[in-house]
Structures are given as structure tokens and as C-alpha cells.
């Protein structure tokens, strides 16, 4: 394989600008498209920019509607972009569905979902939790210290969030399906329950942070919440909250997407760049 020397960073949010900066600092020739940049590296023509790149880096997530690249201005249809790719190119995108990945590689190019890189997902927890705290602080008019919090799910993000809230003095209940996860939460100093018992406890919470990408906060729970309760749903699609039911019951429920790009885009972009460079090294592109 030829070493990658030319890269196109296309679409996304402020993370992609930081990603482009980090790849440039690593010695690569970087161009951008659709980021709203006013610099020498910003390409004016999409076709030319794609043709010159050995690798194209798409956003995280790559798309929301499976039709357009997220964040690109003007909008870029996925199928139009895919038609420009060459067989020898490497295409990288974040959170690719099987359908989108298949459409991107229809011309024979290689497609990699860089968000499957464990290094990136582990490091991405920190800016994600910072984003959760930022959202929470902007929405509440009381201190986290002494508040009653529920964290649904105890994966990487759920665990880091619960530990952080616990350290800030919140009374944290972790709701998780597995007994092992609940045991881990208890050893971390939190209370725990399973989802069957969540309706029994729901009325006591000041806010709920959901990290589970499956329906766990439905009408049975939402109708019991106190009027001031806040839900921050930070899970990926299809999310965990019945937002229509939340509206019916007058519950504030926010779908919080792309938190690292909002709370810490510089660090989040550097994390992506570092992970992508290591991925290229492992795959023989360096």
C-alpha cells in the first residue's frame, strides 16, 4: 500500500477543523470542503478535491438521514459523493450504517468506520461527559451537589457520567439491565436498580441522563416524573426516550447529539486525528 500523504476532510462540525489541523501538523497535505473555512486549504470544487485525495475523512456521525453528509455546506448527497470515489482511495467515516458503507464503496474504494476504533471511543468519553455537564449546567437552576440523578446505562459514557456526578456530590442511581453493571455501579458508590424497578424510583429524580440507544424511558416512567425533572438523552439513534410522550406529560426531554463537537471540539478533533493516524499505521498506510 502507498503511504497516505494527501487527505480531504469533508463536512461535519468544529471537530473536523481541529482534525484537519492535527493531520496537517502530522505532515500530511490536507484540504477541506464544506466546513465553512476561509483558508488556502479550503477547496472550492468538490470533484477536484476528491480526485486529489488519497484518503477522504467524513464526519462523526457521517450522516443523520442516510441521504446527506452531515454538516456539509452546501448539502452533499451521499450517492453523489460516492460516485466520485476512486478504487484506490481510502474512505473513513464515523458511525456508518451497513447501508451507507455499502453505498460509499460501490466504486470499489475501501471504506472504514473509524468510530469502531476502540482508542477513539475510549478517549471520546472525556469530551462527551464534559458536554453532558455543560448541557446540565445550562438547564438547571440548582446545584448538582445534593441533587438526585439517574443514569440509564453503565457502559463507558454512563459509568464516567455517574462517577463524575457522584464526585460532585449528587445522589446517583444507575439503572442498568445486567447484574454485573449494577454491581459495578454500587462499588463505584452509586445506588442501582434494573429497568423494571425504574417506575418505582422515577418520581424522586431531579434529572435523568440516558445513554441507552433503545426505548427505556417510555410513558410508564415519564408520567411519574415530577414536573421539574429534566431528561438529557445522549444515546445514539434510535435514542432511549419517547419524546412524544415526554411532550404530552410536560417533561423537558432534550436529545443531545454530537456533544464532543459542541463542548470540546479542539480536543475531540485531536482525538479523532490521533486515532485515525494509528489506524492507518496498523493498516499499513504509513
Regions found by a protein language model. Give the residues of each.
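N-terminal glycine-/charge-rich "phosphate-binding" loop or analogous flexible N-terminal tail
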Residues: 5-47
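Residues in the short beta-alpha loop(s) of Rossmann-like NAD(P)-binding domains
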Residues: 13, 36, 97, 177-178, ...
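Residues at the starts of beta-strands that form the adenosine-phosphate
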Residues: 6, 29, 90, 148, ...
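Rossmann-like adenosine-cofactor binding region
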Residues: 61-65, 74-91, 187-261
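Rossmann-fold NAD(P)-binding glycine/threonine-rich loop
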Residues: 95-114, 234-280
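Glycine-rich adenosine-cofactor-binding loop
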Residues: 8-18, 23, 145-165
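Glycine/serine-rich phosphate-binding loop and adjoining beta1-alpha1 elements at the start
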Residues: 2-3, 58-145, 256, 275
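NAD(P)-binding Rossmann-fold cofactor-contacting core
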Residues: 26-40, 168-188
Amino acid at each position: 500500500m502507498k503511504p497516505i500523504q494527501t487527505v480531504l476532510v469533508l463536512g461535519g462540525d468544529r471537530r473536523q477543523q481541529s482534525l484537519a489541523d492535527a493531520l496537517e501538523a502530522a505532515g500530511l497535505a490536507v484540504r477541506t470542503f464544506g466546513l465553512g473555512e476561509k483558508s488556502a486549504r479550503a477547496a472550492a470544487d468538490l470533484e477536484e478535491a476528491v480526485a486529489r485525495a488519497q484518503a477522504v475523512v467524513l464526519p462523526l456521525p457521517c450522516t443523520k438521514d442516510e441521504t446527506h453528509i452531515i454538516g456539509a455546506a452546501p448539502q452533499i448527497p451521499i450517492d453523489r459523493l460516492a460516485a466520485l470515489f476512486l478504487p484506490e482511495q481510502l474512505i473513513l467515516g464515523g458511525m456508518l450504517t451497513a447501508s451507507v458503507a455499502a453505498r460509499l464503496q460501490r466504486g470499489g474504494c475501501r471504506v472504514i468506520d473509524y468510530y469502531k476504533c476502540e482508542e477513539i471511543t475510549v478517549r471520546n468519553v472525556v469530551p462527551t461527559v464534559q458536554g453532558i455537564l455543560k448541557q446540565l449546567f445550562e438547564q438547571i437552576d440548582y446545584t448538582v451537589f445534593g441533587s438526585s440523578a439517574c443514569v440509564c446505562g453503565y457502559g463507558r459514557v454512563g459509568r464516567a457520567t455517574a462517577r463524575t456526578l457522584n464526585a460532585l456530590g449528587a445522589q446517583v442511581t444507575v439503572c442498568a439491565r445486567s447484574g454485573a453493571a449494577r454491581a459495578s455501579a454500587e462499588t463505584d458508590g452509586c445506588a442501582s436498580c434494573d429497568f423494571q424497578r425504574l417506575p418505582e424510583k422515577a418520581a424522586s429524580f431531579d434529572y435523568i441522563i440516558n445513554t441507552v440507544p433503545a426505548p427505556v424511558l417510555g410513558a410508564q416512567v415519564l408520567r411519574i416524573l415530577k414536573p421539574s425533572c429534566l431528561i438529557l438523552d445522549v444515546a445514539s439513534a434510535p435514542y432511549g426516550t419517547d419524546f412524544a410522550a415526554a411532550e404530552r406529560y410536560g417533561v423537558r426531554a432534550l436529545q443531545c447529539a454530537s456533544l464532543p463537537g459542541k463542548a470540546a471540539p479542539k480536543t475531540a478533533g485531536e482525538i479523532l486525528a490521533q486515532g485515525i493516524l494509528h489506524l492507518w499505521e496498523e493498516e499499513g498506510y504509513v
